[in-house]
A protein has these predicted regions:
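PDZ/PDZ-like groove recognition
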Residues: 1-8
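Radical SAM enzyme core and accessory elements
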Residues: 3, 269-425
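Terminal peptide-recognition signature
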Residues: 13, 21-24, 49, 90
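Conserved PDZ fold ligand-binding element
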Residues: 15-33
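Short, Lys/Arg- and Gly-enriched loop/turn segments at beta-strand edges
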Residues: 30-38, 57-60
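Conserved Radical SAM active-site core
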Residues: 56-58, 65-208, 218-246
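Structural preference for beta-strand elements that scaffold enzyme active sites
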Residues: 140-142, 178-180, 211-213, 258-260, ...
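Flexible glycine/acidic-rich beta-alpha junction loops that bind and position SAM and/or redox cofactors
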Residues: 189, 209-235, 254-277, 348-353, ...
């Protein structure tokens, strides 16, 4: 059963008399569990819809509509599938007290993997879940492998009953499911020979595995586990050599690069980022893989379209990890627009200075960095630092942040989109 939370005016749902609180029970006699059932089972032009109205009356409708026309209902969020693992590097364990309750939820949900590209370990799948993934062809999935060696993987996940990952992936691959994979590299555990084995076995698995990224483990000052540490520059350099060696094999044999190091891996190693063409279409850019080169490409292809910025001063707020890399993005943007760009790296006051990614910056740190900056016409904030409800990690809203600074603010994941409209005079 799925509950309706809103009905769009002048929609099919409104014509049927559906309302907030209506319970969607079944489609063509099949009970509805969540948004996946709803989307896939109502994809046809004609179907039977069984509902229970707020007054308790149950009605079955025969739906006929043009293919692709939405019914016009908003659904209550699905209950998030909780994680069965206890990884030493779990982000939730590194959160300070006092944040929003939702931030402490350990999610490991294949549905979110398919819909949003969230990485999942697949350790909590039930037989019914496996059947749904295959039936609905939920592909590609984003899978946290970490290690193909079962003993090492179970140690990393702190889950002695975790199923072996390669047979799991094989079963899905035999039914047409593809995967993007990642390894969160924990030094002394799944680097070195273990990482080489993982990359080799995932590559030799076949074309169903579209690629594998290697991301260095990140810890906050609140992390509760002491068996894991962040990698040194030398350890990151060694990992890069393994990644690039596997990428060279893939390039030679398949015409793709397949193996990628996250931008942060290169930053920690003190090694120059590889060129844009090695990222195979930037499929894992949301995972911090190729982010800088992706921004460069957006600027190369779209900066000439930007008008009305000559002489304006723009602050670009980011985490400290990107501070040394952003000039290669901003310098060509400044030349194309005539604007002056100032990079404003911000130390994370919520999680500690060791957390350097822009997406985890709290609103208060952003506000403090911009307070009194009347010399700026505009400040670009990292769009990934705010959620769909308009809140930063510390629950500060964008409106509250804006009220405390003297310049216009814009959220930015793509500089071209953010600067498409000139700043107010």
């Amino acid at each position: 059963m799925i509950r309706v939370t809103a009905v769009q005016p002048e929609s099919i749902a409104e014509e049927l008399g559906l309302a907030e609180g209506t319970e969607l029970l079944a489609v063509n006699g099949r009970e509805l569990e969540d948004f996946l059932d709803w989307e896939f089972l109502t994809a046809e032009e004609e179907f039977l819809l069984h509902v229970r109205q707020p007054d308790g009356e149950e009605i079955e409708y025969e739906i006929e509509r043009p293919l692709g026309e939405p019914l016009g209902v908003s659904l209550e969020p699905a209950r998030i599938r909780r994680c069965a693992n206890r990884c030493d590097f779990c982000f939730v364990d590194g959160l300070p007290d006092g944040l929003r309750d939702v931030l402490y939820i350990r999610d490991d949900d294949y549905r979110l993997s398919f819909r949003y590209g969230n990485f999942a370990t697949l350790t909590n799948l039930k037989p019914k879940d496996i059947e749904r993934i295959i039936e609905f062809r939920l592909s590609p999935l984003y899978v946290s492998v970490h290690a193909t060696d079962p003993t090492v993987r179970r140690y990393l996940l702190r889950n002695p009953t975790a199923p072996e990952i390669l047979p799991q992936l094989r079963h899905f691959a035999d039914h047409g499911i593809e995967f993007h994979t990642q390894v969160v590299m924990s030094p002394g555990v799944n680097d070195g020979g273990v990482l080489e084995q993982t990359l080799r076995e995932l590559y030799e698995f076949g074309s169903a595995i579209l690629g594998c990224s290697v991301v260095p483990v990140g810890l906050t000052e609140f992390s509760k586990h002491h068996l894991v540490r962040e990698p040194t520059a030398e350890e990151c350099q060694a990992a890069i050599r393994l990644v690039e060696a596997r990428a060279a094999v893939a390039r030679r044999e398949r015409g793709i690069y397949w193996a990628f190091g996250a931008d942060e891996l290169y930053v920690r190693a003190g090694v120059e980022l590889p060129p844009a063409e090695i990222y195979d279409g930037f499929d894992q850019v949301e995972n911090g893989v190729g982010s800088v080169r992706w921004l460069q490409r957006q600027i190369e292809t779209g900066a000439d379209e930007l008008q009305g910025w000559a002489g304006r001063r723009i602050g670009v707020v980011t985490g400290t990890a990107m501070g040394q890399l952003m000039p290669m993005v901003l310098d060509p943007l400044a030349r194309a627009t005539g604007a002056t760009f100032e990079l404003i790296p911000v130390v994370n006051t919520l999680f500690g200075a060791s957390v350097t990614t822009a997406g985890l910056l709290p609103g208060i740190a952003l506000q403090q960095a911009l307070t009194g900056r009347r010399d700026l016409d505009l400040a670009l904030l990292p769009g990934e630092a705010i959620n769909d409800d308009g809140l930063f990690m510390d629950s500060m809203s964008l409106d509250l942040l804006s009220a405390g600074v003297p310049m216009e603010l814009r959220l930015s994941k793509d500089f071209i989109d953010a600067l498409h409209v000139p700043a107010a005079a």
